[in-house]
Amino acid sequence: MTSIKQILARHDWENPVVTNWNRLPLHTSMSYANERNKREIKQPRKSLNGPWQFSYFENLSDIDEEWRKKDLPTSKIIHVPSNWQLQGDYDVPVYTNVTYPFPVNPPYVPTENPVGAYSKKVFLDNKWLADNTESHVVFNGVGSAFYLWVNGEWVGYSEDSRLPAEFDITEELRAGENRIAVLVLKWSKGSYFEDQDMWRMSGIFRDVDLIRVPKTRFQDLAIETKLDEDLDDATVEVRAQLVGNSADNLSVTAELFYHGMSLFKATEQFGNRVIDERGTNDGQVSLELPVKNPALWSAEVPNLYDIKVSLHDGEENYQIENKKVGIRKVQIKDGLLTLNNQPLLIRGVNKHEFNSKTGYYVDEKTMIDDIRMMKEHNFNAVRLSHYPNASRWYELCDQYGLYLVDEANIETHGVKPMNYLTNDPKYLPLMMERVTRMVQRDYNHPSIIIWSLGNESGYGHNHDAMYQWIKNTDPSRPIQYEGGGADTPATDIIAPMYARVDQDQVEEVNSKWAIKKWIGLSKENRPLILCEYAHSMGNSLGGFNKYWEAFEKYPRLQGGFIWDWVDQGLLTKNNEGQSYYAYGGDFGDYPNDRQFSLDGLLFPDRTPKPALLEAKYCQQYFAFQLEKDPTGKVNYMTVSNKHLFKTVNDATLIYQILSNDQVIETKKIKLNLAPQTEERVSLNFSDNSNEDVYMNCQIVQDSTDGLIRSGTLLAYKQFILRNKPIMISDVRSSDDYEDFLINDATDSLSISLDDAIWQFNKRTGWLSNWIKNGQEKVLTPLKDQFSRAALDNDIGVSEVTNIDPNAWFERWQATGFNHLNEKLVQFNWTALKDEVRITTQHQFLSPIDQHIMFISSKEYRINHVGDLKVYVDVWRQVADPQPARIGLSVQINATTDAVTYSGLGPMENYPDRRSAAIRGKWDASLKELYTPYVFPSENGLRTEVAYLKFDHHVIRALEQRFSFNLSQFSQAQLSAVTHQHLLKPEEGVWLNIDGYHMGVGGDDSWSPSVSPEFLLSNDHYHYSFSWSNAEGEANV
């Protein structure tokens, strides 16, 4: 009996030639049902999920030889599947994007290589161990490498953490108690090829199954669908490969069903398929089943056929497999990626397998919830970044309809140069195995429309070899690969990441051209699909609409995959027992890239960020257009169905006419729209008022359709029919004027009217207090504000050790922007018949060199109705950097949580991310106005605001609309605190009134990405507003 020491002495995990010992060839998924199984055993599969015994060792040399035969006294219970770093004090998760978490010296890994020793006892009866069967154990995901023992006997070894490892353990099993033991290594040479942007964790993190298979069985079962040019005739081809006994007298029968009705049945004997000039392979068989006028599969209409494939000898069925079949044709034609002859528009997102509680393990309910949320937010495609997913995910995507890019588990981002390994023929077998096994397992899924060679591994000769193997094995699907410039010979699709719409990013090698330009380059006729774009880190996705305007305009710009789906924040607790979401460095992990793991459209608990709503709107499947007669009257609206394959007959169009935020007309129309058609709707309404008039259009799902629930908002659009100019006037007659009481002291100026007092500090120039009925209404002075709590996009760090000096935060810090010194240079006041006017001017100086950065002049007008009107002029004195905002900030005293405003909403919106927001009157609480980004930052802005009412405060736009935040947290606290749970509500409420606010950006998060039109680059800015404080219900 070979000892553990002898097995480990080979150092398989550092041998480039060895990727496995005794692992069985991978194949498409099988149920292994047969007639004997039905009689003798209900399920030929036992789940080994659940509690296992676990022992942890800091390195391989610490392993106790006794563990091979029995559990150690110190072993503890661990749950499988999950990662050991999340279940006890065994190790810490490490988050790093590019940098390897160990010294780079391939194929070698550190001697201090932690090991997890798992074991589980399994009881089997004699029926399970019946003759003519084998027992296999299948590990669907183990990282990064493992050795297997059964009942003390060594069985094998496997690498590649994201594909199944199947072993035949028939000879090692016995009736009664059996012990399955797995020794999992944290690092192996495979880790050099798994340098993905994610938490680095270890263990058995996918399902483990013990399966009972017939000795004579299908080794593999490949199903391919073929369509003629007109899509009228299809062929379902079944290719089976035998393992076990001789193929003599063995046949395969395939029967195709649709909605339970048999369509065609065929039987063939093995050896009927000519392979080459030497003839047939006796262990292979091919069958063809014709289908007339097939119901085609697409993500919009995921029609599936059932096929029953049986292996038999005329008397007995050895194996029966029931599969789902989706008939569709994927091709690149005339420079376009097409499905069923229609050019696709990829509404895609990248998705890691991640759960905030269980790490790499994602259960079926979460998968279904993700698919539902994707489809309800108008996504149709997922790139499986950056490795094959659990098999159940593909089945669900086949069933409910999503296009998939299946990606090989290959990324060598942290080596220099990036193709150091992928250009080395020594590693070709390892890389090729990861591609071939992916294709072999996933071949039958109609949801997979593109294969990917991996991610961020440069471009080497090994990529060419993998590309050719896939092309020869599966010519029915295109291949994409981003590495080496996104347009190498190893990709059928130009697949850049973070290329911009109109801006070239010129580099010494592998420049990223503007996507509009890229498709027009000489001799370039491939479609362009962004494998990653719109980096959704924190408060992001600014400028997203620009991509979609380009996608809609240029046919060869066929969409892309947002980065990414969900924040990778791990739910943990601090020493006080308080739960919070952790990111890089929170576990003392090093190296780490901090909060760069938090770049999803969803928070870690899978609730939506505002950016998700922006994506949903821009990607929606319907378009709305108004038609006007020569007089300018709106007569018709055209509703277009942009689905390629789906008839919309289970949805209702609802449109409302609103005047002054009040609904004056509502109409509902049941839709019946064929794909790629439109309906013209007659509009008959009249409004003679001079108020704002809007038309809100919605399309709502009537009843549940697959995972899309009834009542789901499918699409919407707002048309502004009349835009009333902003006008504010006093409401009292001059006959009612009362005298102001003015107290002009050395250090202060007080203006009293009735029960109100306004106080100005003459030394600082600020409005320092506002007292109403003896109560202070402001807790801090009303002061200029030019900065914001830095967004992740402002900080601009993808690698902590590689900070970009051009990042906004770095530029603001370098000039002292966030801590400007104030200097009052003018303070005057005058009393007129109708009002008191106070004028001030401040200079704002850099604390570094005392250079004047801004000059701000204000005129305060207090009238006899108690309104404070504020007129602000700001002059920028330096060209760079531009400010984050031009506005005012104050901490106000408040006794209520209710907020009402008229402006863009209801969700958080910023100047470059507000396509999804519409005008209206919105009611919200302070909590609803706040966006809880895990890494605190500027948040919750609402733009294009006509008025705001909070507590007894009413703020109205004067000359133009404004933006605001209301929060219990100051910008200073948001800037200082690193985690959401550390924020402490402050006294009162912080109000930020912005005349102007720069965009948030989001083309990427490591370089300045705010488009020029959303930067505050003008020399002069002017804004104004009116502020009143009325007891009781204020009139707005």
Curated annotation (Swiss-Prot):
Cofactor detail note: Binds 2 magnesium ions per monomer. Binds 1 sodium ion per monomer.
One Pfam family linked to the record: Glyco_hydro_2
SUPFAM superfamilies for the chain: (Trans)glycosidases (SSF51445), beta-Galactosidase/glucuronidase domain (SSF49303), Galactose mutarotase-like (SSF74650), Galactose-binding domain-like (SSF49785)
Obligatory cofactor(s): Mg(2+); Na(+)
Reaction catalysis annotation: Hydrolysis of terminal non-reducing beta-D-galactose residues in beta-D-galactosides
Site note Transition state stabilizer, residues: H352, H386
Positions that bind substrate: N97, D197, E456, E532, Y533, A534, H535, D599, W1006
A GO molecular function held by the record: magnesium ion binding
GO cellular component: beta-galactosidase complex
Keywords: Glycosidase, Hydrolase, Magnesium, Metal-binding, Sodium
Residues the entry annotates as binding Na(+): D197, F596, D599
Top enzyme class: hydrolase
Residues the entry annotates as binding Mg(2+) 2: N592
Family annotation (Gene3D superfamilies): 2.70.98.10, Galactose-binding domain-like (2.60.120.260), Glycosidases (3.20.20.80), Immunoglobulins (2.60.40.10)
Active-site residues per Swiss-Prot or TrEMBL entry: E456 (proton donor), E532 (nucleophile)
Gene Ontology annotations of biological process type: lactose catabolic process
InterPro entries according to UniProt: B-gal_small/dom_5, Bact_Beta-galactosidase, Beta-gal/glucu_dom_sf, Gal_mutarotase_sf_dom, Galactose-bd-like_sf, GH-type_carb-bd, Glyco_hydro_2, Glyco_hydro_2_beta_Galsidase
Residues that coordinate or bind Mg(2+) 1: E411, H413, E456
EC annotation from Swiss-Prot or TrEMBL: 3.2.1.23
HAMAP family: Beta_gal (MF_01687)
Family: Belongs to the glycosyl hydrolase 2 family.
Quaternary organization: Homotetramer.
Record-given protein name: Beta-galactosidase
Biological classification of the source: Bacteria, Bacillati, Bacillota, Bacilli, Lactobacillales
Gene name of the encoded protein: lacZ
